[in-house]
Amino acid sequence: MSTMKIPLLLAAALAASDVLGATKAEFDARRSTMVEEITAEQAGLPGPFDPRVKDAIARVPRHLFVPPAQQPYAYENRPLPIGHGQTISQPYIVALMTDLLKLGKQDRVLEIGTGSGYQAAVLAELVRSVYTIEIVAPLATEARARLERLGYRNVEVRTGDGYKGWEERAPFDAIMVTAGADEVPRPLIRQLKPGGRMVPRGAGWEHSVAHAD
């Protein structure tokens, strides 16, 4: 399915949601405020975020990627628990890591650490295909169903050890490692296209980009 059809499916899902009395318009307003907060927080960086990244975050309904008890807080610029000892990342970090990848519309992206699927949805708004791996089986199952329900047909979810990558789908234009790692797993580097970009997250790797030779 073309990503052009995603907004129509999202609109239907949003219209059907009424969390603790909040309306679609109220969620939209909260999301706009969140994007403004992200913009303000990145003011100290060398350059502004790509407008496409901010537009993608403005389109993805974060409240549908967290448990019902967390939905009133979905548009606060902070991580939230999603169960199984995991969290959904702070929106600013989602924007930063996405921006660092310098994505193109035809890119194929591998994400390590699906979580609730929120980061994958943001990536799907920007690229041709997203392949995402989650080691916690219940989270992978929930994320797959959620992304399908919201119309993200250009996302494929796999249950497994993300540090081994996804050789059958390689090579990738970009790889995002959202699960913390002390060093970049070698299989991931091998699965990058020449000139590909990787944003790892972990000790010594925050806010950095690795490039394939």
Feature locations, PLM:
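SAM/dcSAM-binding transferase cores
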Residues: 9, 19-36, 172, 190, ...
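Class I SAM-dependent transferase core
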Residues: 19-110, 121, 126, 141, ...
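Conserved nucleotide-cofactor-binding alpha/beta core module
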Residues: 102-211
